[in-house]
Amino acid sequence: MSENKQRKDTFFGGAAILAAGIIVVKVISAVYKMPLVNILGSSGYADFTAAFNIFNILLTVSTAGIPVAMSKMISEANASHRHKQTHKIFRVSLFFFGAVGIFCSLVMFFGANFFAGIMNDTKAAECMRVLAPSVALVSGLSVFRGYAQGYSNMTPSSVSQIIEALFKLIVGLTLAWYFIRVLGKPDYIGAAGAIAGVTVSELAALLYMAWDYLRTQRHTPSPAPSERPDSAKRILKTCLLLAIPITITA
């Protein structure tokens, strides 16, 4: 089998895995939304949505473009058999984007009252605080996904997305139902419970991706002793030049 045919088969196989994962996630998301709205009511769901509006902005700043940039850089380094380079790309990206994600999480957590006030929904502040750790978790998750995709391995990304959706469904709905229907808490507390399910889902997906990364490291070729990877500064510059245009258009 020629190398071109192998690449083509890998591409279409990866695309099929991603497509299947997206379909499963969409089905789970549809099942999730209907009972969530019923449990939270219009007021609680408004708090839930307000928290996600801020979350999505910070998520765009901290993660948009990372998987694509990482995938391209890892793929190019791997094609040239620069295995030290692939490891360094991963380490530099995880450190930098992880730090950016943690910063954005802190902004969301400590700025929750400010953001909620701007949106005229002060009750949403609690939801924002519960959701804040997810920004950092998704930043790390994006780096792991980009690394796997750089090796044309789409399975971990698809599995992690399904894990996210399932944990969000099970943990989120359970906590929202328990707080409102069993404990009789206000709607915004139920919304915070549902959002806790999101944070747990991101943590579960990140743990899976970290496990998959460690598992696959045992099968990666040993780098050549003479190989000299690029400097961290150059790697970061290249990654940002690839990621920033995607972030701007996201």
Q: PLM ranges: what are they?
A:
Residues L36-I57, D187, A191-A192, R234-L242:
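Interfacial/gating helices of multi-pass transporter permease domains
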Residues V27-Y45, A116-G117, K185-D187, T247-A250:
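Helix-terminus/linker motif at the lipid-water interface of multi-pass membrane proteins
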Residues M1-I28, K84, K88, D230-I246:
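N-terminal membrane topogenesis motif
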Residues F103-T122, R181:
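Short membrane-interface helical motifs at transmembrane helix boundaries
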Residues S139-Q161:
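Membrane-interface junctions at transmembrane-helix termini in multi-pass inner-membrane proteins
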Residues D121-F144:
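Alpha-helical transmembrane segments of multi-pass membrane proteins
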